[in-house]
Amino acid sequence: VDKYMGDGIMAFFENPPDGVISAQAAIKSAVAMQEKAIELDEKYKVQNRFPFSVYVGIATGYAKVGNIGPPEKVDYTVIGSVVNKASRLDSAGNAGDILMDEDTYFFVKDDYDIEDFGSHELKGFEKKVQIFKLTI
């Protein structure tokens, strides 16, 4: 986990240049989060509490990783368009969705039940982005 932002978190997975390991790790983490969210939601319903849900956006690609910021506030983090894409994917879905870009899909398509979610305009991206949805 890189950071907490309001009711969200940002996590990244580093690996060799091929992207396979990080894409698989991100999907495994997303599935684990969604399974726990479903469990908590069921528990909360019995207790008459607010619903609990998680939105997940996963993008695979190159980013700048390292200590970023002025000396008085250096933060080890990740920046780049792939980070922005993951955030936009997160916002494009509904409660319980695990959405991914085409690059992530390429690395995990044989291991999971994934459907085409269509091409969508995402803020900050000139071209429509092909989105895929993982079903758990």
Put a short name on every predicted segment:
Residues 15-56, 60, 81-90, 94:
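Alpha-helical scaffold within the catalytic cores of cyclic-nucleotide enzymes
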Residues 1-18:
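Conserved helix-loop-beta segment at the catalytic/binding core of cyclic-nucleotide signaling proteins
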Residues 13-17, 64-69:
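Active-site loop/short helix in cyclic nucleotide turnover domains
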Residues 8, 51-55, 131:
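Broad gene-expression machinery/nucleic-acid interaction feature
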Residues 63, 92-136:
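Cytosolic regulatory/linker segments at or just downstream of nucleotide-handling modules
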Residues 5, 22, 64, 78-85, ...:
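Helical mechanochemical/support elements of P-loop NTPase systems and associated helical scaffolds
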Residues 2-3, 56, 97-98:
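Residues that recognize and position ribonucleotide moieties
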